[in-house]
Amino acid sequence: MAPRAASPALSENEFDITGALFQNDSESDNERSSAKSKRQPKKKIPSQDLDFLGDVNDDDGDEAFIAQQQTSANRKASNLKGRTVKKGGGFQAMGLSANLLKAIARKGFSVPTPIQRKTIPVIMDDQDVVGMARTGSGKTAAFVIPMIEKLRSHSTKVGARGLILSPSRELALQTLKVVKELGKGTDLKCVLLVGGDSLEEQFTMMAGNPDIVIATPGRFLHLKVEMNLDLYSIRYVVFDEADRLFEMGFAAQLTEILHGLPPNRQTLLFSATLPKSLVEFARAGLQEPTLIRLDTESKISPDLQNAFFSIKSSEKEGALLYILHEVIKMPTGPTEMAQQRQGEDASARFSKANKRKRAEMEKAVNTKESPTQHSTIVFAATKHHVDYLYSLLHEAGFAVSYVYGALDQTARKIQVQNFRSGLSNILVVTDVAARGIDIPILANVINYDFPSQPKIFIHRVGRTARAGRKGWSYSLVRDADAPYLLDLQLFLGRRLVVGRENGDHVNFAEDVVAGGLPRDGLSQNCEWVTKVLGDDADIAAQRTVATKGEKLYMRTRNSASLESAKRAKQVVSSDHWTSIHPLFQDESSNLEAEREKMLARIGGYRPSETIFEVNTRRIGKQESEEALNTIKRVRTTLETKKKRSKANAKSEFLEDAPEGLKTGEGEAGKNEDEAAFSDADDIDAPTGVADDMSLASDSELEVTFSSYSQSNGNKSKKASAASFQNPDYFMSYTPNNNSLAEDRAYGVHSGTNSNFAQASRSATMDLAGDEGSRGFGEPRTMMRWDKRHKKYVARQNDEDGSKGTRLVRGESGAKIASSFRSGRFDAWKRGNRVGRMPRVGEAEAPNLAAGLNAALSGKRFKHRREQAPKRADPLRGDYEKMKKKADKAKERSMSKAGGAAAGGKSELRNTDDIRIARKLKQRRQEKNARPSRKR
C-alpha cells in the first residue's frame, strides 16, 4: 500500500471564512480585484516540508500536528485577507452569524461593552433577563443583536415575532435606527408605531406582516384593540427603560399588553434603576429572570474621595458657590470647547474643507476618553431646585446644563450633549432624570440635597472615579440631614470623623469625614447670593417655588433609622460638628479654626449667678427672697437630672447582663455605680475559664458561655431539666455552623443570581419624584375634590388620561379608554377593499405585503389614473365652469393620445381663420383712421 500524504488534509476549522463574512460587499470585491495584481506567492508552512514517512502509524503525532496548525491559524490574523481580526472575547466568540458580524463591524463596534458582554450570552440561552444599565452603556445593541440572531430572516407566516416597547418617540426612533443598521444583511421587516403618526398608515404596516414592532405602549395598545391583534406569535419582548415606562403612567397599558402575550415568550427588561413596583412587575411577567447588574453600579470605587460639609439651611447656595470657586476651582465664562467653536470663521464654516476638518476633529475627540478636571454634576431634590440653581449658577458666570424628568426629550438630549462635548462644565439634575444618563467623563459630584437612602448616594457617586481615575464627591449636610449621614456611615462600614477631633490624619477615601466650611469665604458667597436675590426678581421667584417644593419633598422622603436619629443629636451638638473640615489644612484654615474655638468659648460662657442673684446685693434679701427660692429649686432639679442621666449612661451596658453582675441586695448602702462595678469585680470566673479570652479556642468559648448563661438563678424548670435528646441520634433542624452564606453558595439552585427575588433585594431602590408626584405603586387617595362640581370624583380618570370619558374593560380586566374601539380599522378595510385578514400562522397575503413594502420605502401612493369628466349639468349654477373644465380635460386627453391636437393646440391656420383675422385687422385700421368727433 502506498504511503499517505505527508501532511494531513485541511480540517474544517482551517477553512477561510473571509468569503462568508464579506460576501456581496462591493468594497471588499474592489479590494480583492485590486489585490489580484499584487498578490504575493503563498508562504509555505515549514512543517509541510518535513518527512513524515517514518511516522505513518503514529496517530499521536498527527493529532499534535493538527492541533499545532489549528492553534497557529487561529492565532495569526493574516489569514483573513484585507481585514483585521479582533482578539478573542469579542463578538466573534458569541456564536453570531456572518451577516450579523459584518453589520456589527460596519457599525463600528469592535469590543462589546460590559453590559453587552454579560447580557448577550444569557439572552442567547433563551433566559429572561432583567438588566440594569444606563443610557449610553450599549444596552440597545445588547438586546437588538440577540433578537436579529434569533429571528434570522423574514417569516412568510402571519404574526410579528419581536416587540420592543419604548417610553418615548425619540427613543423608539433611535432603536429603529439601530435595528435597521444591524439588520442590513437580512430581510427582516421592522415597523415603528408611535403617537402622532397616521393610523391608516400604521394599519397598512401591521397588515403587511412585519417581523419586529417598535412602539410606544399607548399607540400599540390602541392598535391592538382597534385591529384585534393576536400577539400569540411574539417570541421576543423587550421593555426598554422600564422605570420610565412606569413613571410616565403606562402601567395599565403594559398590564393589558402583557396579558395578550404568549407564556412561552422570552422577556427582557432593561432599566437604569429597580424600584419595588418594577420588581413586582418582573416577578409577574418574567419566568425565573436573571438579574444582570454591573459591579461598578453597586459599590463605591476605592479611588473615590468623599467630603461632607456641615452647613445651615440658609447657607446652601453660598456653600455650593464656595465649593465651585475655591475647592474645585471651576472657571467662569465659556469653556475651552465653546471658545474653539466660537473662534471658527463663520464664512468658512460651511465650506467643504472646514466641514471635513470638523468631522475629523469630532471623530478624534472621544468624549468617553477625554475627561476634564472641572466636569461636575450637581444633584438637587426637585425640578424647581434645578431651575433655581441653573439660573443662579448662570448668573454667577458658569457654563451650566440642566436635566429633569419633565424636560422634553429633545431638550434633554441637547443639554446632555452640551455637557458631554464640553460646552458646559456643570450639569444640574435630579435623581429621576440622572438615573438613565451615562456620563463616563465625570470628575466631581456635588450632593446639593443629601440623599435619603445610602443606595441613592452610591448611585450618585458611582458615576465618578472610574477606570482607575481619581474622583471627588462633596455633600452638603444640614442638621436635619445628620441622621441620613449616620445611616450612610453604618451602611458603608467606615469610620466617622467629625471636624479635627483626630487631627490631620484622615483618609478621605476610607473615612466619612464631616466638618464646616471656612467662615470668611462662605460669608462672602452668601452675601453675593443675597444681593442677587434682591436685584433679580425672577431668581427670587424661583427660590420661593423651590422652597415650597422642598417642603413637599421633606414630607415625602424616607425617614432615617431611630438609632441614627438619636446619635445625630449628640453629633450635631458637639463642638466638632461646626469646626473646619480637615480638607482645608493651610495656615489660614488653622487660624480660622482657632477663631472658631474662641467664638465657641465666648458663645458657651455661662455666668455663675443669675440676674436675680445679682440684684439681691443691690436691693436686699427680703424683696428677692421668693425669686431666690425659685432659682434654687430649679437649679436643684437640673443637677438631679444631670446625675441621673450620667448614671443611666454608665449602666446601659449592664442591662442585658446576668443578675449576678448587677447590684447585690445586701449592698444598698453603696452608690449604684460603685456597687455594680464592685460586684462585677468580686465575682469569680467559672471553673475552666481562662483569664485571657482572646486565646481561648472555639470549644472553650462554647463551654464558657453555656456555663455562663446557666449560672443565672432565675432558670425555668424546663430549662433545668435534663434533655431527652440523644446527641448520637438526634438531628437538629438548624445548621450547626454559622456560615449560611457559604452553604448557600455551594447550592445548585441557590447561587447569587439564581433567585431573582433575593438578587433584586440588594438592587431595589426607589427614587422620589422630582415634581412632588407619587410614583407608580405608592399608596394614594382614590378620590379628589372637584372644585367645579363641588363633589368628590374618582382620581383614576385623571391618571389614565381619559378625563372623565367612558372606559371599557380590556382582556386583562384593566380599564382602557373606549376611544380605542373607534371603528377606524373597519373603515380602512372598506376603503382599501380588504376582506378577511389572515390569522396568525397562515401564509401572508401578497398584496398586503406589497403595501407594507411601499409603506416602508417611504413613498406614498399617488392616484395617476385619468378618467373622462362627467358631463356638465345645464341646470346647475356652475355649468359654464364645469363645461370649461371638461373641455380642457378633452384637450389633454387628445394631446396624449396623439392626432390633430397632439402636443398642444395647432399653430397652423386654415383659410377660415385667415379670412376672419383679415377682417378684424381691417376693422381696426378703419377705426384708427377715423377723424375725431371734435372736428
Curated annotation (Swiss-Prot):
List, alphabetically, the InterPro entries matched: DBP10_C, DDX54/DBP10_DEAD-box_helicase, DEAD/DEAH_box_helicase_dom, DEAD_box_RNA_helicase, Helicase_ATP-bd, Helicase_C-like, P-loop_NTPase, RNA-helicase_DEAD-box_CS
Q: Where is this motif: DEAD box?
A: 240-243
Q: Which reaction does it catalyse?
A: ATP + H2O = ADP + phosphate + H(+)
Tell me the domain of life: Eukaryota
Give the subcellular location: Nucleus, Nucleolus
Pfam families linked to this entry: DBP10CT, DEAD, Helicase_C
**Domain Helicase C-terminal: start-end pairs:** 360-514
Q: Which residue stretches, if any, does this entry annotate as coiled coil?
A: none
Task: State the UniProt keywords alphabetically.
Answer: ATP-binding, Helicase, Hydrolase, Nucleotide-binding, Nucleus, Ribosome biogenesis, RNA-binding, rRNA processing
Annotated binding of ATP, by residue: A133, R134, T135, G136, S137, G138, K139, T140
| Ranges of compositional bias, category Basic residues | 35-45
Q: What is this protein called?
A: ATP-dependent RNA helicase dbp10
Originating species:
Aspergillus clavatus (strain ATCC 1007 / CBS 513.65 / DSM 816 / NCTC 3887 / NRRL 1 / QM 1276 / 107)
